[in-house]
């Protein structure tokens, strides 16, 4: 069985300094939908290759009157770094960040999106470790956070496994370094909401020889993927009663600033903003509304206009 020691994703990548100095977006408002983005190796946060997916998906949701925001999964993607350590860090942080956000915003539907090394990370978030020594069974699909995931997308996945019902494109029946049966079984708990894009020529997910097939997913399939996500959102059951998810909060004048952007109210005033209901002494059963959330403008994606091609893939076999 192959063991990935170091896989450097193929790509026309921005300078390493940009990848390491661009700060991640680690929080979001309690919007109707929040997308968790997981970047590829050596890519910056808000990277120009994958961010069009966020813009397209949120644009279509907003056209339907829904609010939409995103969060970056934080992890190191330094070129030439310890690949398994990077994936483990990303998986741990992904589970932690998704769980924490769901606790803050239990009415928000979650979409997860990972590209290349980021697809490996997101696969591990959902299904546990893929060939690395990170010990986890993944995010329980029956947990509150797991149930909140309405759609999950993997693109050019390092651990792409052939012939899965959620595989799409002409690489659906191909694989390079597939997940073990036990890892795959855990990942497949999310099969109803999962989609994995793999082109036949992609060297990373399909063992092909066409570098461009790994680089152009979002140029070719962003519209298709974003429409699929919107369809999943429109066909999923609400996470909270309609009165909770759509009610406009009515804070008192003294605490109005505490609920701007759908953020969690402070403990002293939380009871006064629950869907306009009569305040209680403890606010123990707080349900935070989503629709009134205020979403800040998205940052400008990091451009790839002046990039250089970097290609390096290593495998160690046991």
Model-derived features: where do they sit?
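Conserved beta-strand elements of beta-rich interaction domains across eukaryotes
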Residues: 14-15, 159-160, 202
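Fungal extracellular Ser/Thr-rich, low-complexity intrinsically disordered regions
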Residues: 19-26, 231, 238-318
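Active-site catalytic motif of lipid deacylating hydrolases and related acyltransferases
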Residues: 23-108, 194-222, 231, 235
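C-terminal catalytic-base region of ester-bond hydrolases, centering on the histidine
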Residues: 164-252
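Fungal secretory targeting signals
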Residues: 1-22, 318
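Short, conserved catalytic or adaptor-binding loops enriched in Gly and charged residues
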Residues: 61-64, 145, 184-190
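Serine-dependent carboxylesterase/thioesterase catalytic core
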Residues: 94-113, 117-180, 185
